[in-house]
Amino acid sequence: KDGIFSKISKDIRPPKNAILINGRGKHITAGIIDCHSHTALSAVNEGSQAITSEVRIKDVINPYDIAIYRELAGGLTTANLLHGSANPIGGQNAVIKLRWGSTAEDMIVEDAIEGIKFALGENVKQSNWGDDYDYRYPQTRMGVDQIIRQGFNSALDYKNTWDKYEKSDKKTIIPPRKDLESEALLEIINGERIIHCHS
């Protein structure tokens, strides 16, 4: 009913206006959920810096991507759209319900738990492959670890700066600069954003 299974039974008496489909030889399942997808996206890596927690996948969803139509035909109904794996700390995710012909905004599942993409290992070390790209940091697993630690430490410093400002007189002090990168990392620390880690 309205696109949702309403009853499963051997002896169902459908209402008069129901459309009957002969299911003999067919497989019926609930909608498939893809927990790691790049559907409806292009250029999913922001490679300009190692930490890009301020970028948001929901800002670049392409509702005209033919993959949406094809995946719906295959039974996929929901996808967790993730940033690429070129950064130790990548961008913010978006969970969508695949709706062919809909807008990007209408596909976003607003009450989904907020997430962010992290990555370890070879993708991060060599996101720009080849000998000509040996200048990008990090180049080792030690560097990946250091970048992640630095990101969280910077976010905590940012929080402390704002805490001091909030406790101050405020009349004689300029407020700290807003930092979207640190704010996303603080959401992780506060349990408001979960990490999806490619490793």
Ranges and model annotations:
Residues 18, 40, 90-92:
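Short Asp/Glu-rich motifs
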Residues 1-29:
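Histidine-rich, glycine-flanked metal-binding segment
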Residues 6-10, 27-36, 136-143, 153-156:
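Solvent-exposed, charged interface segments at domain starts and junctions
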Residues 12, 16, 32, 55, ...:
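Solvent-exposed, flexible loop/coil residues
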Residues 72-199:
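Polyanionic/metal-chelating signatures
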Residues 8, 55, 96:
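Short clusters of hydrophobic/aromatic residues that line enzyme substrate/ligand-binding pockets
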Residues 23-88:
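Metal-associated gating/positioning segment near the N- to mid-region
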